[in-house]
Amino acid sequence: PTRRSSDLHRHKNVLLYRQGEINFILNAEPDSFAQRFARLHGPSVCAIAFRVHDAKAAYERALNLGAWGYAGQAGPGELNIPAIKGIGDSLIYLVDRWRGKGGAQPGDIGNIGFFDVDFVPLPGVGSAEMLAPKGHGLKVIDHLTHNVHRGRMAEWAAFYERLFNFREIKYFDIEGQITGVKSKAMTSPCGKIRIPINEEGKDKPGQIQEYLDSYKGEGIQHIAMTSDDLYATVDGLRASAMRLLDTPDTYYELVDQRIPEHGEDVQALRARKILIDGKKDAILLQIFSENQLGPIFFEFIQRKGNEGFGEGNFKALFETMELDQMRRGVLKAPEAAGAEK
């Protein structure tokens, strides 16, 4: 959903896609970690990166606390970026070089980042567009939601807590007609990295288990990105043929009752199928794509003083997805399930 690629790796079959401060790297390099990961999981997210003040110190600290290191192979002129094993044996890279670090200004000596070293702009891409293309108005990655096996949510929450000093900011326990989901939302000390961790809430396999079966293991369920104008972003995404989830019209009939004085144009929300949550003066707008990379999907979100995750929409969305599973035969409707007992 970002745009055409803006940069090509200097030595490898790797493309960089950028929008705002979002960077997606598509790796098609033969015999790479990414290709081996894809052979197991199919279309997937094989790595994420955290900005840290000192990558070497952060890496050594993580190893001392029990993390598993990854020994990558840097090519000529490339940065050797340390990484540890993360969710589902994906990687977490620790990056300590980026533009603007420590208040550095454009033109300052040494104000270069990882992408400046390893990538070159494609022909026709200007410097301003290369650094922060506007695209559909997406700004930053808001959160990265993980799906894990039942009973492993607390273990992964402790992983982020122990290695990176994350803390829990939200806990959810949502029940549908047949299945359920539990989730712990973790955040980094700076508040810029949010990672909700989901597991099945009941014995009956549901949406989380379907993901785990499809993905062949634990991993990132969806990537959420922010916008300062979600209405315009959704219009742009639809014009680009992005498939977004539908929301029944009945949802919008209750918006004014559910969130008095929300200040949004309900007809504009309805026309774009945008969801709304929160309360007066603390509103969150969100919409989800259909699955885009195997079982992985995207969320597009606008925060207006609300730091939640759309909790008020969770149950409605969960039940909608559960109904879809029933229609596809993944779950049996309650009557059918009861008839077999």
Task: Describe the function of each predicted region.
Residues 166:
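Phosphate-binding active sites in nucleotide-utilizing proteins
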Residues 18-28, 50-142, 146-148, 153, ...:
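Vicinal oxygen chelate
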Residues 33-38, 95-96, 135, 204-212:
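ER-lumen resident redox/N-glycosylation machinery signature
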Residues 1-5:
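Short, small-residue-biased leader/transition segments that mark boundaries at the very start
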Residues 6-7, 13-18, 23-28, 32-40, ...:
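Basic, Lys/Arg-rich alpha-helical nucleic-acid-recognition elements, primarily the DNA-binding modules
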Residues 217:
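Long C-terminal interaction/binding lobes of large macromolecular proteins
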